[in-house]
A protein has these predicted regions:
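Nucleic-acid endonuclease domains
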Residues: 1-154
Length: 154
């Protein structure tokens, strides 16, 4: 099974924490999904928490589900995320490593785009390869601030 480097894991968790703080500045009902399910079901195996998070994202704001993703210039994206993270109010939040820009993309848009990208097997799992610059070219992307204003109804 593919294991991300410690540096990549820390970068992703740091980005997720930054996003939690940012959304907490603007909204009342911001939930870290893993913490939430662990409080509800404290003695479950790790797979239960992983499954919940894969379907609900990293952050939940009311009925909006957000999955935080840090992106290198050339990256891979897990097929399992394409299968599990979907719905009208599911969004990916991408932070581009090279420019430090942050964009929000509806899961439907991203999942459709990813299906056009090359499949890559890696240690028993399937991934799709893509470039960070492609995120900038998506018509349905929003900047983080614009996305927050949209949710707030401003």
């Amino acid at each position: 099974m593919f294991r991300a480097s410690k540096e990549k894991i820390e970068k992703g968790l740091n980005f997720q924490n930054v996003m939690l703080d940012k959304f907490n500045e603007h909204f009342k009902n911001v939930v870290d999904s893993r913490s939430y399910i662990m409080k509800l079901k404290p003695d479950e195996p790790e797979v239960v928490y992983n499954t919940f998070e894969s379907k609900n994202g990293d952050i939940i704001i009311d009925d909006i589900h957000l999955e935080c993703v840090t992106v290198a210039k050339s990256s891979i994206f897990p097929e399992s995320k394409l299968r599990n993270f979907r719905g009208k109010k599911h969004y990916y939040i991408f932070r581009l490593d090279d420019t430090e820009e942050t964009f929000v993309v509806p899961s439907y848009t991203w999942n459709c785009y990813m299906k056009k990208c090359k499949k890559i097997p890696k240690q028993g799992r399937m991934y799709r390869s893509f470039k960070a610059s492609h995120i900038k070219g998506l018509r349905r992307k929003k900047t983080l601030d614009t996305f927050i204003q949209t949710i707030k109804g401003e």
